[in-house]
Amino acid sequence: MLIFLLLGWTFCGLALCGTAYALLAARFAGRFVKKPLPDNASRAAVSLLKPLHGGAPGLAEDLESFCRQDYAGPVQIVFGVQDAADPSIPIVEALKARFPALEIALVLDDKSHGPNAKVSNLANIMAAARHDLLILSDDDIAVPPDWLAVCAE
């Protein structure tokens, strides 16, 4: 009979521990929920630096995704190439024509700052960046419309 009493109290204790764990988990679960983005009016000015090289498949669509950002703060997109014959130049010019309200700059500078071409390209386009908040991105990715807001948060 004593064994049944001990088993009963053991299972009650385990049930209480499980209940306490569930209550604590419910209490602190809010810490892991995505926080809302700040109001658009308080967004920081951003310079987005995009070093380009060549005309990879889908480049126009990838670059266009950066032009379609849902971000109310000032945005400057600075594209950079090191070769005047780079096939990405006409794509950038088409974006400038398609999105005239955006501040889009194209920097052509073949100056080398070391053995890494991408780093040299970034160093060349840094001078054209007007804002303190800099976001760097490769040319071969597409992003969702809230990408810039999440990055600038």
Regions found by a protein language model. Give the residues of each.
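N-terminal membrane-anchoring/stem segments of glycan-assembly enzymes
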Residues: 1-42
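Active-site acidic short loop of glycosyltransferases
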Residues: 43, 72, 101, 127-132
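Cell-envelope/extracellular polymer assembly enzymes that use nucleotide-activated donors
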Residues: 44-47, 76
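Donor nucleotide-sugar binding loop of glycosyltransferases
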Residues: 55-58, 84, 144
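A short, glycine-/small-residue-rich helix N-cap motif at loop->alpha-helix starts
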Residues: 57, 111-120, 142
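Acidic donor-binding segment of Leloir-type glycosyltransferases
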Residues: 63-113
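Acidic donor-binding/catalytic loop of UDP-sugar-dependent glycosyltransferases
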Residues: 87, 132, 138-153
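Short aromatic/hydrophobic "clamp" motif used to bind/position activated sugar donors
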Residues: 122, 134
